[in-house]
Amino acid sequence: MVSRVAKNPIKIPTGVEVNVAGQQITVKGKLGTLTRVIHRAVKVTKTDAELQTICANDSPGSNALAGTARAVLANMVQGVHTGFQRKLVMVGVGYRAKAEDKKLNLTVGLSHPVNIEMPEGITVETPSQTEIIVKGADKQRVSQVAANIREIRPPEPYKGKGIRYDNERVILKEAKKK
């Protein structure tokens, strides 16, 4: 029995180079190089323009691992080809963001400005003072950096002030009545 996710092969677009060396998979593209070691219960085979993940043995849970490995590899291929981005929006009076080189400066109502150093392979843009766009080739890293930025001032439930994802809905509570 094969995982439904792992059944689908991953198409390798032109300009993307995939190297399979045992359990270590390296994907190169115009946006960089990503390397990941996959679990030994999963076998990756490469044909002309496709990658296929299959279970290497019949151990319990290997179907799930094959599906997970397929999703991770698909994200790696997409990441080096088109990249990933997360958009954050700041809501609040005086809340501002400014990107400088590999740093993000935030003014979010604290007694001091917050400076965040971006990790390798991650870029940050501020199209306006209240918008932050985090870009990169590694989906996990982009999402983690965006979550770290949001964690500085998460949206509060009464007025909705804080840093939120662009598509996030904040459910507002009603104030206490007398």
UniProtKB/Swiss-Prot annotation:
InterPro entries: Ribosomal_uL6-like, Ribosomal_uL6-like_a/b-dom_sf, Ribosomal_uL6_a/b-dom, Ribosomal_uL6_bac-type, Ribosomal_uL6_CS. PROSITE patterns: RIBOSOMAL_L6_1. Transmembrane segments: none annotated. One of its GO terms (biological process) is cytoplasmic translation. Keywords: Ribonucleoprotein, Ribosomal protein, RNA-binding, rRNA-binding. This protein binds to the 23S rRNA, and is important in its secondary structure. It is located near the subunit interface in the base of the L7/L12 stalk, and near the tRNA binding site of the peptidyltransferase center. Belongs to the universal ribosomal protein uL6 family. One of its GO terms (molecular function) is structural constituent of ribosome. Part of the 50S ribosomal subunit. GO terms for cellular component: cytosolic large ribosomal subunit. This is Large ribosomal subunit protein uL6. The keyword Transmembrane does not apply.
